[in-house]
Every structure is written in structure tokens, then in C-alpha cells.
A protein has these predicted regions:
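Glycine-rich phosphate-binding "P-loop"
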Residues: 16, 136-154, 169
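N-terminal subdomain of lithium-sensitive/metallo-dependent phosphomonoesterases centered on the IMPase/IPPase/PAP
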Residues: 2-95, 157, 161, 188, ...
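A short local loop/turn or secondary-structure capping micro-motif enriched for an aromatic residue
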Residues: 113-114, 134, 325-328
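A short glycine/serine-rich beta->alpha loop
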Residues: 15-18, 39, 103, 142-144, ...
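Short basic, glycine-rich beta-strand/loop surfaces that mediate nucleic-acid
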Residues: 84-85, 114-117, 215-219
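DPxDG-like acidic metal-binding loop motif
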Residues: 89-100, 104-125
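Flexible glycine-/small-residue-enriched beta->alpha junction loops
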Residues: 119-147
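An extended, acidic
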Residues: 150-310
Length: 332
């Protein structure tokens, strides 16, 4: 039975921004962190999924998962199309990655996070679980400074010119994959530096938005489409540019995309096409990385480090929390 909510939707979203959405990623991060270094990617991911779904269902929203753990026949929970929340309050789209960097968590390596985005209903890109070409830079540049179809070398030179520096002062973040060898060669041919990461391209894209602190000016490469939408939600909140294209290189992938509303398989998506309305983004560290500190387990306290953002205000909050009611994390 639906519960009447008297709070105006705009105020309700603000409340979610400050508290509820943070609790969702905190719970997922703590559950995954209990399995750091255990070498079991599936167990860590499942623990995060279970915790995130449980918390989502406590929120006063009518939520639909549009970016999740897979399509209905591939994932038992948080699948694309699943309804979450209390069936009360605003209708929202939900994008989740309960554990980005499953390998990082399993090996207790830096940079694993629990992350999600929430947007006005019908405004997030419904992307199939395929690969996506991506390029991203931070705020402060004219639109079109970099382009997805330009070469990596050209994009470095164009960004360097816009920034007023030599190409050797530019650093490009790239996932360390064999498929990116040409990108790496092209970037280095200009004198620019490449920073390689093993996993975690949501956090990788976010790094571009704050080059003064992260040392990263641009992200280039091919990664998961779901992660691309989550990263776009973050940039929608904090500023920046991003261009993406789904890689639909088989009939089966094109058909899956068509069923999800993709009419042009060659379309280049900007942030505004992937996130068309007000959105919230939150991420909590699982293992300590350059973006967030990992979960810390003390004798009587659990510490979490979270960033939460909202597009309509441009507000970014960092929340370092100490949790003393520990049983709230371990409800199996």
C-alpha cells in the first residue's frame, strides 16, 4: 500500500542528497570491505549488492533500476527494470555499481568504491551492458575542445592549447588494457604523460574534474557502458565534458540496445544525453584510493568516507562518518 508523502519532491530530493543516498553507498561499501583481500570477487560483489538493495528499499521513492547488475535474466537483484524503494515519493531512475573494482577489493588494492546515481524518472540513459568508448575532461573549457572521433594525439594537443600549457604538462588516465595500446602510444607521442589504472573507470573519469588535486587532465578509453552513465552523472554535478559511444558490434548487441530505446547505434552521447535532468551521485570508498579513503574497522567504530553531489545546485559534500551502531551494517 502506497504511503502518502507530504514533503515537496524538491525538498525530498534534498533530504536524500544529504542523508539517505549516503547511507546506501555506506552500507554497500562496508559489506564489501568485510571481504577485502579474501580473493573472492563474486562474494564481495554479492555482499555489496545485497546491502545496497536492502537500503534502497528503505527510501521514500518510486525507483526503477536503469543501470544495474545486468538484465533480468542475468542478475537476481538490482537488475535493469527492477523496482526499488517504498513506492512513495518521487519517481526516479537509479544507476548502481555496488562494487566498482571487484578485483581491487578481492586483492585489497587501492580504488574500489560503492557508487550510485539517482535522477528524475525517465532522464537517465538506458544503456545495455556493453562496452562504450569514452573521453572526458574537467570543467572550464569551451564545448568541443576534445572529440571522441579525434585521435588521442590531437585531443592532447587541443586540450593543451585550451589550457595554455605545453602537451608535456598534460596527463591522461587510461585503463591498463591491451586494447588501449594505440591510445597510450598516441598520447605519449605528444610528450604527454599516461597514468595507467587497473580498474575503476567511474573514479577515473571523476579525477578529470579536479586536475589541480588529482593531476589528471583527461580520460580516454573503452570501458563498460553502465560505468559511463554513472561517470556522466558525476560530471553533470561537478562540471566537465564527456563524449561516449556504445560499441554495438554484433547483431545481438544492437538488438539489445534497440529494445532499450537506442535508435542510432553510432550516436555520440554527451553528458546532457546520458543524464537529462536533476541528478544525485554518491560514492563511498571500499579500499583507500586517491578519490576516497577505504572503510576502517575499529574496535567499536566503523569509519566511512563518502562524496555526494547534486547537479541542480552543484554542491559537493565529503562526509567522513564514524558509525557506532554497528549492528545496522550486519543484518543478514
Amino acid at each position: 500500500m502506497s504511503t502518502h508523502i507530504s514533503v515537496p519532491p524538491q525538498l525530498l530530493l534534498e533530504r536524500i542528497l544529504t542523508l539517505e543516498i549516503v547511507r546506501v553507498t555506506e552500507r554497500a561499501a562496508v559489506s564489501a570491505a568485510r571481504l577485502r583481500g579474501h580473493g573472492n570477487e563474486k562474494a564481495a560483489d554479492q555482499a555489496a549488492v545485497d546491502a545496497m538493495r536492502r537500503e534502497l528499499n528503505k527510501l521514500p521513492i518510486e525507483g526503477t533500476v536503469v543501470i544495474g547488475e545486468g538484465e533480468r535474466d542475468e542478475a537476481p537483484m538490482l537488475f535493469i527494470g527492477e523496482k526499488v524503494g517504498m513506492n512513495a515519493g518521487p519517481q526516479v531512475d537509479i544507476a548502481v555499481d555496488p562494487l566498482e573494482g571487484t578485483t581491487l577489493c578481492a586483492k585489497n588494492m587501492p580504488g574500489a568504491i560503492a557508487t550510485m546515481a539517482m535522477a528524475d524518472g525517465g532522464t537517465l540513459l538506458h544503456a545495455p551492458d556493453v562496452y562504450m568508448q569514452k573521453i572526458a575532461i574537467g570543467p572550464g573549457y569551451k564545448k568541443g575542445v576534445v572529440e571522441l572521433d579525434a585521435s588521442p594525439a590531437d585531443n592532447v594537443r587541443r586540450l593543451a592549447k585550451a589550457k595554455g600549457v605545453d602537451a608535456s604538462a598534460i596527463t591522461v588516465l587510461v585503463l591498463d588494457r591491451p586494447r588501449h595500446s594505440d591510445i597510450i602510444t598516441g598520447v605519449r607521442s605528444t610528450g604527454a604523460a599516461v597514468r595507467l589504472i587497473t580498474d575503476g573507470d567511474v573514479a577515473g573519469v571523476i579525477h578529470c574534474a579536479d586536475p589541480d588535486n588529482t593531476g589528471v587532465d583527461m580520460y580516454i578509453g573503452t570501458g563498460g557502458a553502465p560505468e559511463g552513465v554513472l561517470a556522466a552523472a558525476a560530471l553533470r554535478c561537478i562540471g566537465g565534458q564527456m563524449q561516449c559511444r556504445l560499441i554495438l558490434d554484433t547483431d545481438e548487441r544492437r538488438e539489445r540496445a534497440r529494445k532499450m530505446g537506442v535508435t542510432d547505434p553510432r550516436m555520440i552521447y554527451g553528458i546532457e544525453e546520458m543524464v537529462r535532468g536533476d541528478c544525485l551521485f554518491a560514492a563511498t570508498g571500499v579500499t583507500t584510493g586517491s578519490l576516497l579513503a577505504g572503510v576502517k574497522f575499529r574496535k567499536d567504530v566503523i569509519e566511512t568516507d563518502t562524496v555526494v553531489m547534486r547537479s541542480v545546485t552543484g554542491t559537493v559534500r565529503y562526509i567522513r562518518a564514524e558509525h557506532r551502531q554497528l549492528d545496522k551494517f550486519f543484518l543478514d
